[in-house]
Amino acid sequence: MNAIECKQVSVWYDDVCALDAVSLTVPEGDFLGIIGPNGGGKSTLLKTLLGLLEPASGSIAIFGKKPAEASRLIGYVPQFSRFDRRFPASVMDVALMGRLPARLTAFFSYSRHDRQYVETLLEQLEIADLKDRQIGRLSGGQLQRVLIARALAAEPRLLLLDEPTASVDTRSKEQIYQLLKELNRHLTVVIVTHDVGVISSHIRTVACLNQQLHYHGEPELTGGLVEQVFGCPVDLLAHGAPHRVLKEHGEGIA
């Protein structure tokens, strides 16, 4: 079964086109990286998959269901820079939010199973020792793991992440990608990223998005294609190391 099927999906913000006739199929078990310039529609695509935005035209199926019907099958990790660290909550409090039901009752409380499940997740993500720490006292990498734990607490089949390694140090970035690679053993993973340097070493397939879908396939991109999508030479994106986009030096770069 396919985890995601988008057919000719277009999304508009008033008179501005964010997505233009995007068709994309993601098989279950894939690890897809979506790259593209700022304003290219990457976050808009995630929001549309989540059912937060309604496409102006086209159709979307998540495991064969409409996004609104598949919400419990999806875990979402937003950019942590948009997460208010002043929120008075502990690591455990935030992770437990993933166990909240679709409809809350006045007397809702987490079950023992909920707490045990989340504690196990925190152990697997190597942040169990931080469970009582306030989120305002976490590093960027630690907070990102907490947000991943919250998403996994819902027991999803599809994990969507919006730039999970933005503003984290190099060591934390590598740890997060290794974690996602491990999670991909039993989850479909879709990640939005500007980090073209990780495309070849961590993900299975890549989608280049700039309002339209320019490429979807193996993570071996030519410099010309990336320049077409981003509108600038590939060496500007990879900080002087254009061959980091590919598996081996010289493959596909003229």
Language model regions located:
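Conserved ABC ATPase signature
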Residues: Q134-L138, Q142
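Conserved ABC transporter NBD signature motif
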Residues: G58-I74
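Catalytic Walker B motif of ABC-type/P-loop ATPase nucleotide-binding domains
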Residues: L159-E163
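ABC ATPase nucleotide-binding domains
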Residues: T222-A254
